[in-house]
Regions:
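Active-site activation/catalytic loop segments of kinase-like enzymes and analogous catalytic loops
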Residues: 138-147, 205-240, 254-271, 283-290
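An alpha-helical support segment within catalytic cores of ATP-dependent transferases
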Residues: 2-11, 122-176, 243
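Conserved N-terminal boundary motif of the eukaryotic protein kinase catalytic domain
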Residues: 16-22
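All-alpha amphipathic helical-bundle segments outside canonical DNA-binding/catalytic cores
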Residues: 126-132, 241-253, 278
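Hydrophobic packing residues in well-ordered alpha-helices of helical domains and bundles
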Residues: 57, 103-110, 133, 154-161, ...
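Active-site acidic catalytic loop and adjacent metal/ATP-binding pocket
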Residues: 31-36, 117, 163-209, 219-220
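ATP-binding pocket architecture of kinase catalytic cores
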Residues: 24, 30-132, 139, 146-148
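ATP/Mg2+ or Mg2+-diphosphate-binding catalytic cores
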Residues: 262-316
Length: 316
């Protein structure tokens, strides 16, 4: 959308904005804008009603608020035009403010928040199905490899998907934000606030652990991961030790990164949006890193996919 379109939408929601600043465009098609009048600012989230609605977001927002979990207050909702207006939490997302000095504190506080989310009542939260988890991994094979890189994966990728499915089925299934990563966590008034929670499902424990501990913008850091898993195990008084939690995280990260590589490639193929292509090499590298050393897919990624991806990005 253009700025004038957003200003016009905000006026239909009883907020007479004089300026609109784009914040981010999500893979789902949601657009977040900061809208400002002479004395206040809000966040306008737009989703074309033909593509979906905000009902899941509103339902989860109410659940979070009812259980004292910090999230953006929804001030206005107009389903006919696909808009919510939310309290502006500022720009201090954890990806932006994260550094060597504060990372341990922020990661521990994020894990505390994750534990609270996992403890929410589950009656209103749908459960991920086996088929959904498998279909998400197939995005990697069918979209990222075949359609985007134009390479036919060898049997090691099918075996990796099968092995991942078997492992994540054996994990504890808990409330899963599904995108519990640093850019979706905002430090506001010294509290970590969670956003973009509309896709919350009951799913494997390792998916959200990998979201916060294996970021798309940094190489895997096993020292930090092991330290934080030890902390998390003690905080939630888990019957699973840090070694078991690492196994959950490993397979959760493999499923998650395969899904995201396919999703981001599809955004470019279907909509010609290239804004996330720069993230693909690190996501692929982290996927390779988390695959067990003796698995043949590791070699396929290293020798075939990584060179093809680098060439593809140079050609775009």
């Amino acid at each position: 959308m253009k700025e004038e379109d957003v200003i016009n939408l905000s006026s239909k929601c009883n907020f007479n904005a004089t300026k609109a600043i784009p914040l981010k465009l999500e893979a789902s098609g949601r657009e977040d804008w900061r809208v400002l009048d002479k004395k206040d600012s809000l966040v306008l989230c737009y989703l074309n009603p033909s593509l979906g609605d905000h009902l899941d977001f509103l339902k989860i927002s109410n659940l979070l608020n009812a259980n004292n979990i910090c999230t953006a207050e929804v001030i206005y909702h107009n389903p006919d035009i696909g808009v919510t207006l939310q309290k502006d939490l500022g720009d201090d997302d954890l990806l932006t403010i994260f550094n060597e000095e504060n990372k341990q504190d922020l990661l521990k506080r994020s894990l505390d928040l994750l534990a609270k989310i996992q403890g929410l009542p589950q009656e209103e939260i749908p459960k991920l199905t086996h088929d959904e988890l498998v279909d998400q991994m197939h995005l990697f094979k069918d979209i990222f490899c075949i359609n985007f890189l134009e390479v036919e994966p060898d049997n090691s990728i099918d075996n990796l998907m099968l092995l991942t499915t078997e492992n994540i089925k054996q994990q504890p299934w808990v409330n899963c934000h599904f995108d519990f990563e640093r850019r979706n966590l905002i430090l506001h008034q010294d509290k970590i606030t969670v956003i973009d929670h509309q896709d919350m499902k009951i799913g494997p424990l390792g998916i959200d652990l990998s979201g916060i501990l294996i970021d798309h913008y940094y190489p895997v850091n096993f020292t930090d991961i092991n330290m934080m898993l030890d902390y998390f195990s003690k905080q939630i008084k888990s019957k699973h030790d840090s070694e078991e939690l690492f196994n959950f995280l490993r397979w959760g990260s493999i499923q998650r990164n395969m899904r995201i590589l396919g999703t981001l490639a599809n955004i470019f193929i279907e909509h010609k949006r290239s804004y996330r292509l720069k993230d693909l090499p690190m996501i692929l590298s982290n996927l390779e890193c988390m695959i067990p050393d003796n698995h043949k897919s590791k070699l396929f990624i290293s020798e075939q996919l990584k060179p093809l991806l680098n060439k593809k990005l140079l050609d775009i």
